[in-house]
Structure formats: C-alpha cells, structure tokens
Amino acid sequence: MAGRFDPLTRTTVRGGATRVPAPTPATPNATATGGTAGTGAKTGTGARPRTATGGINGQAATGTAPRTRHYTPPGPLTLGLVLGPLRRGPHDPTFRVTPDGAVWRASQTPAGPGTLRVTARAADGTVTGEAWGPGADWLLDRLPALLGAEDDPAAFVPRHRLVHASHRSRPGLRLTRTGLVLESLIPSVLEQKVTADEAYRAWRILVRQYGTPAPGPAPDRMYAMPDARTWCRIPSWDWHKAGVDSKRSGTILRAARVAPRLEEAAGMDLPEASARLELVPGIGPWTSAETLQRSNGHPDAVTVGDLHLPGIIGFALAGDRTTDDAAMLELLAPYEGQRHRATRLILLAGLTPPRRKPRMPRTDIGRL
C-alpha cells in the first residue's frame, strides 16, 4: 500500500511529510532576475517585488533586495520531503509553507539571523533561494547541502517489499543537511519524554518570546530562534510558563553554554559527532540522533530509545508491534549505513499498528 498513496498522519509527518502546494506560474512582476540556473550564482538584484505597505500577510516590507541563488539538483527533488523534517509542528515560527509553493525558513546562523525562501520550478526542477538578513550569504552558500546535494540516494538498496514501494514512490526524497547543530538540538531536547504537541507548544512560545523577527518580507510571526547567549538568559519562570521542566531546561542551558563546541559536530563523522553531543549531561543517543539527522544529514543516524519507533518498525517489517530497540536494530541490519533513510521510508509508508491504549496524557506544568 505504501506506493499507492501518501497518507498524512502523525507517523508520516514524523517521517518528514510536509505538503507544499504546486508553485504558482511565474509572472513578470514576481520573478527573480539574478543568477543562472545550475551555476549556483548569487546576486543582490533578484528581488521579488513586494507591496509598499506590507510584505507577505501584512508584515512590513524592509525594502532590501534579497540575495538570490539558483540551484539545479542532480535528480528529482521534493521540497516537502527534503525540508519537512525541519518543521517542528504546524505552527513552527521558524518554518512556513505559503500557498504559492514556497518554503520559508528563519535561522540563527553564525553570521546572524537570516530568512530563506525556497521555490522549485516544476518545468525543469530548478530551485531558487532568496535570502535576507545578516545570515543571507551563509544560508545561500549552504543551499545545495540543505537540499540534499551531499546525500547519495543511489547508495540505498531496499530489502523489504514495503520499503521498496515507499522508496520507488518517493524519488524526490533526499536527506537535508543544515549545518546548524543548536537549531536542531534544542527542539529535540524539548521533545524528550513529552507529547509532540507539548514540545511544539514550548518551542513556539520560547522562539516567539525570545527569538529575532525574521529579516525581510517573511510571513507574519516568523522568527529566527534565539542565539546561544539569549537561551542562557531565559528566566526559570518563563521555562515554566512554556511547560518545560527543569531537567529539559537545564540540558538546554548546558548545551547553550558550550554552543561553539557543539556546532563543530556539524563537520564530524557520525561517531565523533554523537560523542561530542553526548558529553553534555541530559543528551543521550535519542537526542543526538534526532539532531544529527538534520544538522549533518547522516543516512545512518538511527533513533534509539524512542517510545513508538521500535513498534512501528517491527510491525511494518515483521508484523510484531512489541519490538524493542535491539530487535529493531536487528531488523534494520540489512540497511547498515542507511538506517535513517530506511526508517524514514517506513514512517512515510504510514503503516502503523492499531492503537490499543489511550494516548499519552498532556501535562501543562505552566498551570501549576
């Protein structure tokens, strides 16, 4: 069934399924003029005209022309699958999909905050990136890596019928690499041992309260996450109001204090990168894997210690919903070196065991 439809459930969303509308046809008043497709050229003159009174959805336009880069991927590329894992919930203030088929991201880069707008042209697959803010050049320099240029899908060989069907029906799946460790680490820590909705709410509250408004004509209420110094200055009562307990907030504070050392992991191989992150108390194999899947785009960064994942993998591959981590890793052994990609394809297939017990209850410590 995996190859016949694309379900949108909690499981497939976790696999990175994000629906991106088909791009609207280009018009003379809404086309970028800078750069040459396929060359990776950048220019500061390829502005998409905005209204004088407000950019998109009413946010004030800055009048600053974006930096622009065009990139032609070597094969099929589906923006929703490639960038979907970077979205933390449907109301993530750092990630937005607009009706014109554009994906917007606001990031805190080493050069400062930046906004990136990514669109793909249906005719030839050319991707255009437009960026604003101090981090614009940094974001455009890494646009190909963000879109999976450093990934090698050809190295993956399906070994199960379901995986083969999921793989065949998603030729545009590539593993993103953001090059930003803290950006993926902090929301992963927030997701430790709570429901996804609780973690998304905490991320949304903290980023909107302490983050930087997204530069340029970004959609309303978009923010780049706080920098490391700002994370360290968040008072305990605001963590509490966001529903974050002292264990998770303490882990984030410890990570923020050594942020430069953690960011070095973006250039390391998987074992060294995992070891670097796990030196911080409160960061274990689950959190490091969830982080490095996004920051490093490593195809073998398999998540262990997860409440639901072993049962999903076991049910999909062996019909066993009681699978534990050890049995899951045994089932994934044929995909050694590509276990993260295999896991994503299984999640995207949407085959999950029937629910037998109530959902994990939500707890809002901010009301205490």
Segments the model singles out, each with a brief description of its role:
Residues 1-35, 39-368:
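HhH-family (HhH-GPD) DNA N-glycosylase catalytic core used in base-excision repair
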